[in-house]
Amino acid sequence: MSDINIKIGLAEMLKGGVIMDVVNAEQAEIAQQAGAVAVMALERVPADIRKDGGIARMSDPKLIKEIMSVVSIPVMAKARIGHFVEAQILESLGVDFIDESEVLTPADELNHIDKDSFKVPFVCGCTNLGEALRRIGEGAALIRTKGEAGTGNIVEAVRQLRQVNKDINYIKNADKSELMAIAKNLQAPYDLVTYVHKNGKLPVPNFSAGGVATPADAALMMQLGAESVFVGSGIFKSA
């Protein structure tokens, strides 16, 4: 049902830019005018989700449609981890990317969405290479760090990106005979570990998110190897 290469190609088009969290159509227009490569449609930014507590779900379809109607750049929206019906709703709305997001309250603590069964590309978060490769194995077309969304604190995003890069470098320089053991240790698909060994990078774009609060933070992540950054509530909330 899906062609992963087409999905990855769509994700590649977002490289070298900023993806901005927006909570209404006006913010979406401002983000587009300011040069954002995409917007993330949200009812509440992560900082407010943290502050308010309670259950965080997919955004109201009405809000997503309003945002889609005023911008020409890609529109992303978040679904809860494992909530494939929220993802089906988002796909039917015509969003350009779905972020299966840990910022929302998980619907399934054991299983992620089977992303290959959708035509729309998925974004997924990771804290290390094993997690990244498992999500790619499920059909993710774009990987990002999880960081600490809504805090304005960049430290976790930096740690995670450095860890992914370190793990990639280790696999790239490993002997071919070690790859099966590495795959088992990472709990990752063997073919994806082999890809990393041969190419020295993930098979999908590698972005950064979670606590990116200033232009300097965004530049830091890019210079550490992130191919784009998700700039969220941190940029408004950071003191």
From Swiss-Prot:
Coiled coil: none annotated. It catalyses: aldehydo-D-ribose 5-phosphate + D-glyceraldehyde 3-phosphate + L-glutamine = pyridoxal 5'-phosphate + L-glutamate + phosphate + 3 H2O + H(+). Pathway: Cofactor biosynthesis; pyridoxal 5'-phosphate biosynthesis. The active site is at 78 (schiff-base intermediate with d-ribose 5-phosphate). GO terms for biological process: amino acid metabolic process; pyridoxal phosphate biosynthetic process; pyridoxine biosynthetic process. Signal peptide: none annotated. Its EC number is 4.3.3.6. One of its GO terms (molecular function) is pyridoxal 5'-phosphate synthase (glutamine hydrolysing) activity. PROSITE patterns: PDXS_SNZ_1, PDXS_SNZ_2. Keywords: Lyase, Pyridoxal phosphate, Schiff base. D-glyceraldehyde 3-phosphate binds at residue 162. D-ribose 5-phosphate binds at residues 21, 150, 211, 232-233. InterPro entries: Aldolase_TIM, PdxS/SNZ, PdxS/SNZ_N, RibuloseP-bd_barrel. Belongs to the PdxS/SNZ family. NCBIfam families: PRK04180.1 (NF003215). Catalyzes the formation of pyridoxal 5'-phosphate from ribose 5-phosphate (RBP), glyceraldehyde 3-phosphate (G3P) and ammonia. The ammonia is provided by the PdxT subunit. Can also use ribulose 5-phosphate and dihydroxyacetone phosphate as substrates, resulting from enzyme-catalyzed isomerization of RBP and G3P, respectively. In the presence of PdxT, forms a dodecamer of heterodimers. This is Pyridoxal 5'-phosphate synthase subunit PdxS.
